[in-house]
């Protein structure tokens, strides 16, 4: 869920800044083919537009900037602020295991510690002769204090001695690590504000070390609260099956992008007050980074669906019908009454794919009644109501069979039988649709058709 993208977009647009998309792809093991295109499509679908991106500018993919990173790696090596490390992954793992067994906090111990210059030269020659490709590590000032005034959380401070020792800025394959590359990119592209999740807080002191080593001024940082599952109270996980966390899921199910943007925009930020439905323009106007929440934001799928339903109810029929069309077509239900069916169920929908289940009544066998529905149909006045309505519907011509004419027939049954309220409407609804609740009854009867409505009532009477 691209919460940080959304809020960074609002920040940039509110302040009249430049919003850009940069592809951070230095971790080749996690590289996903076609992932970039998919991410950009999802942002476009949400209505997030940008000023600069790999589509319009060169070198906006980190994998295309290796020569730029190499320049600064070489600079730090030449200045003695970084060094080549020949420790193997196996040696690092063994040392980490030893430290954990001894109850120590795992950290990298400088491999050259205690070596003379001659010993160091011999060590490097031996390692290179063995074909070991080095990494490059930043020499950490362990006595240094790295602090910043976080936009969201206020002042945060780290001691240089508590970040795990000298850390890798360039991997064996020549690619930079994330914490090194983003500093180079942010500085050269003139990024003024970095807004991201608070899982990046531990990365910030490392990035400040790089800014310090290169003599550059750091941007402002803001770390947004983590997102928790509203049902479990725990950090949102990909394994949480009760939530839709990926934009692809919302697109696939036929949610309105405006609703998803609205929901995301309120995760970790709110403008104050009780209002929860905002247009994109209102979001941009109202956005205030000082109102970014310090407390965890709850991802509530029910609230997302409520919000989506509000958008669908207020959207024009053509928009929702076009959203629902693919689902109706796939289910073989794109009939001449399809648009009327969408209009009928539009007030109940949270996503367009729900139209298939909602319209089962019109295309499937009559559903099995629940215990509660059977209890309603056991009422002593039910046969009277159903027989009276059946007679009214049988007397109607096909030309007269319209929603505006069906409701007066139901009212006539009320007048003739003296039965009203739920004792009148509930048995009719259950007999016709097999459900206790649903859209307007005259519209349901009309779309079901006169013959099928009479057949359902007749079958119900026989079962009583």
From Swiss-Prot:
A cellular component annotation (GO) from this entry: cytosol
Pfam families, per the entry: Anticodon_2, tRNA-synt_1c
EC number: 6.1.1.17
Keyword list, A-Z: Aminoacyl-tRNA synthetase, ATP-binding, Cytoplasm, Ligase, Nucleotide-binding, Protein biosynthesis
GO terms, biological process: glutamyl-tRNA aminoacylation
'KMSKS' region, short sequence motif: residues: 235-239
Protein name according to UniProt: Glutamate--tRNA ligase
Source organism of the structure: Streptococcus suis (strain 05ZYH33)
């Amino acid at each position: 869920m691209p919460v940080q993208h959304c809020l960074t977009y609002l920040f940039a647009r509110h302040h009249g800044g430049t919003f850009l998309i940069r592809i951070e792809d230095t971790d080749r093991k996690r590289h996903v083919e076609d992932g970039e295109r998919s991410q950009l499509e999802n942002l476009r679908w949400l209505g997030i537009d940008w000023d600069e991106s790999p589509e319009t500018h060169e070198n906006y993919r980190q994998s295309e900037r290796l020569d730029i990173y190499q320049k600064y790696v070489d600079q730090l090596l030449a200045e003695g602020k970084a060094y080549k490390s020949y420790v193997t992954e196996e040696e690092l793992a063994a040392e980490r295991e030893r430290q954990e067994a001894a109850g120590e906090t795992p950290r990298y111990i400088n491999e050259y510690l205690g070596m003379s210059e001659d010993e160091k030269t011999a060590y490097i020659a031996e390692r290179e002769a063995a074909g070991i490709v080095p990494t490059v590590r930043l020499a950490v000032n362990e006595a240094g204090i790295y602090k910043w005034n976080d936009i969201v959380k206020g002042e945060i401070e780290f001691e240089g001695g508590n970040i795990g020792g000298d850390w890798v800025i360039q991997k064996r394959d020549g690619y930079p690590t994330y914490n090194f590359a983003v500093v180079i990119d942010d500085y050269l592209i003139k990024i003024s504000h970095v807004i991201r999740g608070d899982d990046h807080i531990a990365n910030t002191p490392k990035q400040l070390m790089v800014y310090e080593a290169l003599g550059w001024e750091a941007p402002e940082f803001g770390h947004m609260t983590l997102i928790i599952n509203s049902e479990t109270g725990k950090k949102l996980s990909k394994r949480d099956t009760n939530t839709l966390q990926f934009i692809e899921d919302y697109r696939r199910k036929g949610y309105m992008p405006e609703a998803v943007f609205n929901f995301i925009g309120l995760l970790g930020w709110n403008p104050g007050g009780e209002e929860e439905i905002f247009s994109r323009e209102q979001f941009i106007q109202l956005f205030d980074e000082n109102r970014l929440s310090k407390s965890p934001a709850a991802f509530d799928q029910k609230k997302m669906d409520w919000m989506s339903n509000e958008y669908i109810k207020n959207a024009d029929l053509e928009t929702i019908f076009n959203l629902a069309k693919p689902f109706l077509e796939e289910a073989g239900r794109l009939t001449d009454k399809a648009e009327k069916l969408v209009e009928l169920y539009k007030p109940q929908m949270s996503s367009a794919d729900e139209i298939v289940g909602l319209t089962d009544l019109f295309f499937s066998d009559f559903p099995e009644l629940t215990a509660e529905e059977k209890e309603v149909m056991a009422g002593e006045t039910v046969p009277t109501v159903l027989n009276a309505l059946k007679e009214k519907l049988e007397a109607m011509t096909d030309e007269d069979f319209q929603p505006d004419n069906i409701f007066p027939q139901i009212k006539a049954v009320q007048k003739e039988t003296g039965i009203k309220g739920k004792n009148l409407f509930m048995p009719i609804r259950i007999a016709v649709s097999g459900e206790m609740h649903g859209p307007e009854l005259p519209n349901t009867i009309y779309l079901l058709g006169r013959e099928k409505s009479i057949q359902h009532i007749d079958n119900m009477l026989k079962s009583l």
